[in-house]
């Protein structure tokens, strides 16, 4: 009879790796799916849903990410300050040009589970608008995403 084993938190922390992803000409949704899977640890053999076993991800060139179709023109992103009249509306073009890091972060956050682990998982995501980052000491592995 086979025995099933559960991953311990300490073992998961010891095996974490760093990945570097270049977002140049990648579609936002497809990039976000792959990044969310790596952050959760679903690409590992010993995936356990209740343990944060995912790896760290660094995304560079976030301002070169692509929205398909007419989303850059038609989609709007909303923020509210919880004050009267505090609704801010941003178009897709504005989000890509000024807030591309926030656009990717929101997209990845929407693909994570809605529980206590999601904030902890999202803290392992680092997004930079250009190709310079401050994580050379971690020696990240370059992850080539072949997305159509």
UniProtKB/Swiss-Prot annotation:
- What cellular component terms from Gene Ontology apply here? cytosolic large ribosomal subunit
InterPro entries xref list? Ribosomal_uL13, Ribosomal_uL13_bac-type, Ribosomal_uL13_CS, Ribosomal_uL13_sf
List the Pfam families.
Ribosomal_L13 (PF00572)
Keyword Ligase assigned to the entry: answer is no
One GO MF term, please?
A: structural constituent of ribosome
Question: PROSITE patterns recorded for this chain?
Answer: RIBOSOMAL_L13 (PS00783)
**In Gene Ontology terms, what is a biological process of this protein?**
translation
Q: What are the record keywords, sorted?
A: Ribonucleoprotein, Ribosomal protein
Q: What SUPFAM superfamilies does the record tag this protein with?
A: Ribosomal protein L13
> Family, per the entry?
Belongs to the universal ribosomal protein uL13 family.
- What quaternary structure, including any partners, is listed in this protein's UniProt entry? Part of the 50S ribosomal subunit.
Its biological function? Answer: This protein is one of the early assembly proteins of the 50S ribosomal subunit, although it is not seen to bind rRNA by itself. It is important during the early stages of 50S assembly.
Q: Which PANTHER family match?
A: LARGE RIBOSOMAL SUBUNIT PROTEIN UL13M, RIBOSOMAL PROTEIN L13
Q: What is this protein called?
A: Large ribosomal subunit protein uL13
């Amino acid at each position: 009879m086979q025995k099933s084993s559960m991953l311990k938190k300490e073992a998961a922390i010891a095996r974490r790796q760093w990945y570097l992803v270049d977002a140049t000409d990648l579609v936002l949704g497809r990039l976000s799916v792959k990044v969310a899977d790596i952050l959760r640890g679903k690409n590992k053999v010993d995936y356990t849903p209740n343990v944060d076993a995912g790896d760290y991800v660094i995304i560079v060139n976030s301002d070169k990410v692509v929205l398909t179709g007419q989303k850059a023109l038609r989609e709007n992103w909303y923020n509210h300050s919880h004050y009267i009249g505090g609704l801010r509306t941003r178009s897709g073009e504005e989000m890509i040009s000024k807030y591309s890091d926030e656009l990717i972060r929101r997209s990845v956050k929407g693909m994570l589970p809605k529980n206590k682990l999601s904030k902890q998982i999202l803290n392992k995501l680092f997004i930079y608008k250009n190709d310079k980052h401050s994580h050379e000491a971690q020696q990240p592995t370059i992850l080539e995403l072949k997305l159509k």
